[in-house]
Amino acid sequence: FLCIRSPKRKIYFPEDGVAYYPCDMKKFEHQRIQPRQAQFSREHPDFWPKLFEETEKRGMTVSGWTVCLHNTRIGMAYPDTCVHNAYGDAVYYNQCPSNPDVRTYMCTLLDDLCTQVPLDALELESMNFMGHAHEYHHEKDGIGLSGLQDFLLSICFCDHCKARARAEGIDADAAQQAVHRMLAQLSETQFTKEENERFFVQKLAFFENEPALYA
């Protein structure tokens, strides 16, 4: 992070996937996913009280920002809670919104955060399926994917997403096989600019010839 007005440092490298406030761990004791408190928060327990004290003196409000389902630490610790592509690969940097453990964790975390830190506003980032294009850190892509390829690689086929699809009458296995087939074809042929533009214009209608995927 660039902290241009900081008297101590101009660039700050944060810990990954940790909480920068004093979590009430009792709220999480019966949950599978557990938060980890940042070293900064442990070393500076008076940070938030001092911040609110100083901002109140100056008539300022305090807003916060937290990243929700984009947590590689949690993904590595609980890989089954992640988005899984059509090949069954875990996308470690993105927890799946359909996963009940993920939902319980996020609801508890946000409730605890808003209780412990009385912010005037809170921005929630990545409360969604992030997509393949977001990727991780310093990826090497020697091919260059089309918009269609990126979309197909972004569809989650974890057990919970497939169960929800089946509950809606969708043949999730057939949809997964359709993604396999389309990605294999795209890797063997040159996907033209015109076809890519047609995908962006038609959106879901592009898959009308793949009933399970279109559903």
Name each model feature, range by range:
Residues 8-25, 75-86, 137-139:
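Short, flexible, mixed-charge acidic loops at enzyme active sites
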Residues 145-213:
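Extended, charge-rich helix/loop segments that form flexible
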Residues 63-117, 134, 141-167:
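Active-site-adjacent "subsite" loops/lids of carbohydrate-active enzymes
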Residues 48-53, 110-114:
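Generic structural signal for well-ordered alpha-helices
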Residues 1-43:
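Aromatic-lined carbohydrate-binding/catalytic grooves of carbohydrate-active enzymes
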